[in-house]
Design a protein with these regions (language model features):
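Catalytic domains that recognize anionic headgroups
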Residues: 1-470
């Protein structure tokens, strides 16, 4: 949302539909000599009534990824594939004991649906990342060279499931863990890892993730090679950016949790890559200045010649990328709507865990994936009931979301994610970390430096108040 709408979202709402008042990059391209494309496989991006494809001239969606995996629910699963073959027995037993049966059920359902899709694959060229990049190339081949174009390629990989090539190809070994002999748990159970996984299992899960990233990198290279072959290299700006990282275990790997199941904006989740390549931009240069998701849209419209509007809260990064300026802001922020705010400076990172009396914006009582998602799918659910097809899984009302919602540890719609075993559990005290001595945020030094913590907290509160006011 922040990438498309040029505005910070942390102070306003979580993952929810676009508002009529939101202005996106595609909206700004309308009426201009610019063709716009959306190529994606992100289920959350196309939730009913969310409107993220709004304004794009051409849209391609590839079925099957998370929250859309029910697309394959009625396919027959052959080849001897079984969901339980991708979880260690002791993990399934402990998950039921520690987290409850409702946690395993939606996960097993998702794995089974994924296997029903995966059984059709012949090579890594059938993976979602490969199909998305090949579709992007097909559209690049057809662009009108007399016009500018804006292409948003939203590739859900390397998001879970981390089904890297070695998982489904018996002739391959994971290049980052070739000697592992256990099961490939490519969709690990979310939650605290203590008592659930062994250290060796966690190591292999991270190796599968690394292999999945390598696969995505290969197919991103396919896109870049075709940009060069098509003669677009000298007049096309390419921005590679992610929306979040992933906790994957103990210590610096994930602060004790697996996957995005707590509203904790630590380094492994909040520090994401942004790589830019384009004519006039120096090569092989790493920029230390802070950038944010809301800088993507101003950068794109600046490049397209539309101009950066004063109401945009983000900044065009072209001056920063060219070396004309050293920075566009003094600090960055991160966090989860309703649960956490974080401020990151050159020397420090500070995390404030919100209390109940601080959650008072208009729709704050509904967490991420809360009220908006429920309302947006309600009409489809009513249609399903009216047609009396209660026994069918194919009447789509985001069954995946409903399954995950049942498994969450919060009641009703007051939950912040549609991930099974997720909870709003947050630490009791705010946290301060020295970025130079402790880049992975493992040693809270707020008691040792209370004056620094107080100063950063005041700065953070002021900035969030300004965002709310604007």
């Amino acid at each position: 949302r922040a990438m498309l709408t040029v505005r910070y979202t942390l102070s306003v709402k979580g993952w929810s539909q676009l508002d009529v008042s939101d202005t996106t990059i595609a909206d700004l391209c309308w009426g201009q000599p610019i063709d716009s494309y959306l190529i994606h496989d992100s289920g959350p991006f196309r939730l009913p009534k969310f409107g993220y494809s709004r304004g794009f001239d051409k849209v391609f969606f590839l079925h099957g990824h998370e929250t859309d995996h029910q697309y394959y629910a009625q396919d027959e699963l052959g080849g001897g594939l079984k969901a339980e073959d991708y979880y260690e027995d002791h993990v399934m037993e402990k998950a039921d004991e520690i987290l409850g049966e409702n946690v395993m059920r939606p996960l097993m359902n998702q794995v089974e649906c994924h296997l029903k899709e995966r059984q059709y694959w012949k090579s890594d060229g059938d993976q979602h990342a490969a199909q998305i990049m090949k579709e992007a190339v097909r559209n690049l081949e057809r662009v009108d060279r007399n016009k500018s174009f804006f292409m948003w390629i939203d590739c859900f990989d390397p998001h879970e499931p981390w089904d890297a090539p070695s998982v489904y190809d018996p002739d391959l070994k994971c290049p980052y863990d070739p000697d592992y002999e256990g099961k490939d748990m490519f969709l690990p159970i979310q939650g605290h890892v203590d008592g659930l996984y062994t250290d060796r299992e966690l190591e292999h899960i991270r190796a599968l993730y690394a292999e999945k990233v390598t696969m995505v990198d290969k197919w991103f290279g396919h896109l870049m090679n075709n940009i060069r072959t098509l003669g677009m290299e000298d007049d096309t700006l390419v921005i590679l950016v992610s929306d979040h990282g992933s906790p994957m275990g103990k210590g610096e790997h994930g602060h004790g949790i697996m996957r995005k199941c707590r509203p904790w904006p630590y380094e492994e989740l909040a520090h994401i890559p942004m790589i830019m390549r384009g004519p006039g931009l120096p090569r092989n240069r790493r920029v230390r200045g802070f950038v944010q998701s809301c800088d993507v849209a101003p950068t794109v419209v600046d490049w397209l010649g539309i101009g950066v509007h004063p109401s945009m809260q983000g900044h065009s990064l072209l001056p920063l990328a060219k070396g004309d300026v050293e920075k566009v802001r003094e600090f960055a922020i991160a966090g989860y709507f309703r649960y956490s705010w974080s401020i990151i400076t050159e020397d420090w990172s500070f995390i404030h865990w919100l209390k109940d009396d601080e959650k008072s914006v208009a729709d704050a009582r509904f967490g991420i994936y809360g009220k908006d998602l429920g309302e947006s799918t309600a009409h489809i659910l009513q249609m399903k009931k009216a047609n009396a097809v209660e026994d069918r899984d194919t009447a789509f009302y985001n069954r995946a979301y409903e399954e995950h919602k049942k498994a969450a540890t919060l009641d009703g719609e007051d939950q912040w994610t549609c991930t099974a075993a997720a909870s709003s559990e947050v630490p009791a005290r705010d946290e301060l970390y020295c970025r130079k001595d402790d880049p992975f945020q493992l040693n809270n030094v707020s008691a040792k430096h209370p004056e620094v913590a107080k100063e950063l907290f005041e700065q953070l509160k002021l900035f969030m108040a300004e965002l709310r006011a604007s």
